[in-house]
Amino acid sequence: MVLEMKVIAFVGYPLSGKSTAAEVARELGLPVVVMGDVVREEAARRGLELTDENLGKVARELREKEGMDAIAKRCIPKIRELLKEHGVVVVDGIRGVAEVERFKKAFGDDFVLIAIECPLEVRFERVKMRKRSDDVSSIEELKERDRREESWGLKEAMEMADFTVENTGSYEDFVEKIRQILLKLAKNVEIEIRTKIHPTESEDKVLKAIRNIFPDAEIEISEEGEVYGRAYSLDRFRELLRKQRILDTARSEILKGRNGKEVTIYLNKQTATVSRINFCDENAVLSPIKVTFRLNNIPFSRFLDYIAPETKDGRPVKEIDKL
């Protein structure tokens, strides 16, 4: 089965939120190629200090010598390599039309461009917080940087975007906007975890039970003891199923818990505290761990075979190494 590949790129003016968007992608487990790193690496190779002036000079020279799509061309081999392993790659830092056209030529309909819009004044306020060595020191410098990038076709590149995200509200609102759009575009499994801490239970043990199965879980606890968590890595869950040799049971539970693009299973909380998986009913004593897998751009059959493939004589008939 050939799965859809996806290259998701961010374009925007300096300090509009591209780096934040890239960090959201990393938190979702998506690999990120930072186009600006090509310029920073070239400047470092030349022994130059990483100032805005030096980086601008290096970027300009690369484009004059190798074409306006020079930086994009240098990124493509790395993107292709990451696509082989992950299926989805996020690109941070498109600066002009030529780069968009180069990526479209290389990846066709698998290339998606997201524009981030943010006013000049808001962007300058972020300079003071980011404190990066190559940042501008005044709003006039930022305007000059805008003009420089516009000369490369930045404004036209933003007009070519498939999606536009406004970054004018709170940091949390922007992060959630980016997270939602990436989840829709990327091959991804979002894992929602719910349970309850009863008066007779230890909070530490309940949290340990969850993280024994999903180590990357981000967990919140309400005053009433309701536990909500979100995770993205399936590695430990898969590992334990194979270690315990319960793939047939897991496959059955996944099939039973399927509802469209979601799969819900219930895990025994007590056995999870010792890093063991034991499936149970929804109404189990002391509230089980309810796990819901939301499939984004992943066929259910692929997810099923990746987590719990069919077996023969207790061994997987065919293992799938990646989604």
Swiss-Prot record:
GO molecular-function terms, A-Z: ATP binding
Keyword ATP-binding: yes
Pfam families: AAA_17 (PF13207), RNA_binding (PF01877)
Tree of life domain: Archaea
Residue numbers spanned by region UPF0200: 1-185
Record: residues binding ATP: G12, Y13, P14, L15, S16, G17, K18, S19
SUPFAM superfamilies noted in UniProt: P-loop containing nucleoside triphosphate hydrolases, RL5-like
Region (UPF0201): 186-323
UniProt keyword annotations, A-Z: ATP-binding, Nucleotide-binding
Family: In the N-terminal section; belongs to the UPF0200 family.
Protein name in UniProt: UPF0200/UPF0201 protein AF_1395
Species in which this protein is naturally found: Archaeoglobus fulgidus (strain ATCC 49558 / DSM 4304 / JCM 9628 / NBRC 100126 / VC-16)
